[in-house]
Amino acid sequence: MGQTYKFKLQRLLDLREKEEDGKKIVFMEALREKNRVEEELKGLEDSFQRYSTVNNNMSVTERKIQHHYLNLLNSTIDITQEKLKTDEERVKLTRKELVTAQVNKKIVGILKDKDQAAFIKEENRIEQIQNDEFALYGFIRECGRR
């Protein structure tokens, strides 16, 4: 075993690993943002449900203020739902990019594994040839001594 294994495409593998790590970070950020928007939407909907009940003890001014607040909440809910849709699309897109990056890295990883297995097989073959030669020389020496 004379040489150490060196993968010829190691720089490409490193590049693919960095790309995958970057895609993971982008995906996690997109997922975090989507979850934040979902929580915001849930809070707005809860607030809308809480204030949408009509109280007969309220004055006309209070009812008008409540009506304006509910309209504001409703428009904010609509805006937040649109933002949630765009965030869900972003999550789908970043997930697809992440899967592509993982596949690309795995392809190069498989190439490395196959190359390393071939290297080890060749090293073992060379070592076996050397062992056979040593055994042959030892046998010839023993035959010569007799």
Name every feature range the model reports, one short phrase each.
Residues 1-146:
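Charge-rich amphipathic alpha-helical interaction elements
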